[in-house]
């Protein structure tokens, strides 16, 4: 039997890779530091560039996929997005004509089916041996792999161990995300009529960007997320904390509420969501807009020396606002599985060359996009 490929990280990239390999009869084992509890209960935009090739390995049609993962499937919806919503194509990398809003937790649950996932495994060490790379985890578990895939996100332990000089860059933007639950009858009466049939709506107030998104609908309630973001203002901006710890993300400064109050009257549904008294009861997180990148020579070096390759945010993170990181990770996984399945001696090296070009294009596109998102409306003339 073929030795299973160890995949570190069971997020979208790792899970998609596992399913794509399974589709080809290639075994894998996913090691994830988190637990099996449902997580990431928020909405993402899926572009057809990513989900169309995913349908084949899942043996689903697009309508069935939407019925499984769309944010509003419980109420008969298909994750629709208004044409008024600007979707970033990143200079043609993504086809946005038939994009829809999916609940990430639902998508991950779907992708987990049939996979061998080892939960609560935090990577401790990677050692090169005659049998390949040996992975050691904090719980004393270990495994060997002739190829190891780092798919463990922007805070990648694999990257920290093998490429410690590469750290995420923090872009000069302030961003906060909040979650709220609204009674279904209230949402249907007071929110939905002003959202133009879309599961995500956006507005500008000078250089500030405001977004409201449906995460999921149930019979009794609707889960909603909001985003408030803007460029950093000077060196003493109280809302910009680029050096905060991960644990400090839920420490929300009072200045946020003061700034939102100062925006004045907003149109519905923004007036209901960005009500500072209601916001104080929301689960709010401070977001950092991160990017990562590695040179092609560094990646080839790790592939040749340690038989390790990277996908997704572990090696080319894009900012949450203006980025297409979820779609990029899915495409990484699908194309890497193709390269592995061909069993060519230079297959993964060639895959790196192809994808690195797309990663550079995506990073540049996401940075242009986040800049344009925060331009005052009168000066915003180019499309995202």
Feature annotation, model-predicted:
Residues 87-95, 99, 181-282:
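Conserved FAD/dinucleotide-binding core of flavoprotein oxidoreductases
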Residues 8, 31, 151, 311-313:
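Active-site flanking residues adjacent to catalytic metal/cofactor-binding acidic residues
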């Amino acid at each position: 039997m073929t030795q299973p490929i160890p995949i570190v990280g069971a997020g979208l990239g790792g899970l998609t890779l596992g399913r794509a390999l399974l589709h080809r009869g290639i075994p894998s084992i996913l090691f994830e530091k988190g637990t099996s509890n449902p997580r990431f209960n928020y909405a993402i935009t899926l572009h057809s560039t990513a989900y169309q090739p995913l349908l084949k390995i899942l043996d689903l049609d697009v309508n069935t996929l939407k019925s499984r993962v769309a944010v509003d499937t419980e109420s008969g919806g298909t994750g629709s997005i208004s044409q008024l919503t600007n979707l970033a194509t990143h200079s043609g990398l993504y086809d946005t004509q038939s994009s829809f809003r999916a609940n990430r937790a639902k998508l991950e649950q779907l992708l987990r089916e049939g996979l061998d996932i080892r939960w609560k495994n935090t990577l401790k060490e990677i050692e090169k041996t005659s049998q390949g790379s040996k992975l050691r985890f904090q719980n004393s578990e270990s495994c060997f792999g002739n190829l190891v895939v780092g798919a463990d996100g922007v805070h990648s332990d694999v990257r920290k161990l093998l490429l410690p000089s590469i750290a995420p860059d923090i872009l000069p933007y302030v961003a906060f995300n909040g979650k709220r639950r609204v009674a279904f009858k209230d949402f249907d009466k007071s929110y939905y009529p002003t959202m133009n049939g879309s599961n995500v709506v956006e507005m500008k107030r000078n250089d500030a960007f405001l977004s409201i998104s449906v995460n999921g609908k149930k019979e009794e309630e609707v889960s909603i997320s909001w985003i408030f973001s803007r460029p950093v203002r000077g060196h003493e901006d109280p809302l910009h904390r680029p050096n905060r710890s991960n644990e400090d993300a839920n420490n929300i400064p009072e200045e946020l509420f003061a700034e939102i109050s100062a925006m004045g009257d907003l149109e519905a549904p923004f007036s209901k969501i960005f009500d500072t008294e209601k916001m104080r009861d929301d689960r709010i997180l401070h977001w950092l807009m991160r990017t990562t990148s590695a040179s092609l020579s560094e990646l080839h070096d790790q592939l040749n020396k340690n038989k390790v390759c990277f996908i997704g945010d572990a090696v080319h993170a894009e900012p949450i606002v203006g980025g297409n990181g979820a779609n990029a990770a899915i495409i990484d996984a699908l194309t890497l599985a193709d390269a592995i399945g061909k069993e060519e001696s230079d297959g993964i090296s060639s895959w790196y060359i192809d994808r690195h070009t797309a990663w550079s294009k995506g990073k540049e596109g996401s940075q242009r996009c986040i800049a344009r998102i925060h331009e005052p409306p009168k000066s915003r003339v180019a499309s995202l």
